[in-house]
């Protein structure tokens, strides 16, 4: 025989009655009846569970409108701003490069109004959506033409599909990389309908290896920049200039996937060198692909530079339409590229470069300012220290190189890992979550990417 329902269940008001109460009118106007009804059902389910466990009504059942408003205020957006104190500047899971203010403004303008996405003001007819950005890229890199898609994986896939479907692609064995999300070059080639031909060895590949692999079915000679790992020691590799010369000699196009790609010499800012697309174009490579949201500091996009005859083939392929960038991406990319026309102001205007070049002394001073107020908040349960550390660029850029930085560390006085886990879990529930990293029994907050100290203190003191 089933148990009798708890008598307190009868004190829970009906949804329709609650929605018709005068106190609900402001909430109905703000959120609408569907969301309110769904949220009230959730609250009632929780109230029944509370009654079943404690045999009494929860305190919030005395004021349903207040409980409803509190629950609605706790709703989380799908994408939530966070403090990135992980020590990884271009963190893939945290959205990679923050956009420049001019790029944010350009995206906002593009969202608010009709724009000349595929409309030519000169001829009052249909234009090409890549044209304006392509012209900027050509001016900055010396390429003949450019093509924009929604990310670099799409750029590589489009390039392989158009240039070498049903043909062989020759690649050094040491460059068959896997990037995030199990994106493997051999798998991409297979999906694009290409036959992979591996040459050389993991650590040494010579020009003769490429030459010996060429036959009547060779469609492409390709290099892939190993942006997320490095092989050192007894190594040899074929330069882009050598490979381009071989391709021209044999009438076979050449391509390089740079992955990250920087339009400026990073050593100019005290950072490690990274291959630049314009260098490869000057070396004679036919097509070069790279990302928009890594070292470039722009939105997620895949950029393909190269010879006009090949870019036109890419633009005309049906797959290009499926992979094309939208107006917001193009607006942000256009605004970001314009910053490169003023290289002397780039550090000032491009957030990613500003964070990468931030002096260690400035970060240390930030740590000193934060230490005392955070000890006041957390000193009972944690020992707080200032420690030197190494930041990384992230997103597969310059994998070996590190940037000197400073961090605040939190060591639990009880020595328990569960205490650290509880702290990090609580910080993830903040209005603006604080994301650090746990290592060596401590929580590390690398301060390289912190630009609003007051906002961080407000969150951590809440």
Curated annotation (Swiss-Prot):
The gene is selA. The lineage of its organism: Bacteria, Pseudomonadati, Pseudomonadota, Gammaproteobacteria, Enterobacterales. It comes from the Bacteria. It is found in: Cytoplasm. GO terms for biological process: conversion of seryl-tRNAsec to selenocys-tRNAsec; selenocysteine incorporation. This is L-seryl-tRNA(Sec) selenium transferase. InterPro entries: PyrdxlP-dep_Trfase (IPR015424), PyrdxlP-dep_Trfase_major (IPR015421), SelA-like (IPR018319), SelA_trans (IPR004534), SelA_trans_N_dom (IPR025862). It catalyses: L-seryl-tRNA(Sec) + selenophosphate + H(+) = L-selenocysteinyl-tRNA(Sec) + phosphate. Belongs to the SelA family. The modification N6-(pyridoxal phosphate)lysine is found at residue 294. Converts seryl-tRNA(Sec) to selenocysteinyl-tRNA(Sec) required for selenoprotein biosynthesis. The keyword Cytoplasm applies. Its cofactor is pyridoxal 5'-phosphate. GO terms for molecular function: L-seryl-tRNA(Sec) selenium transferase activity.
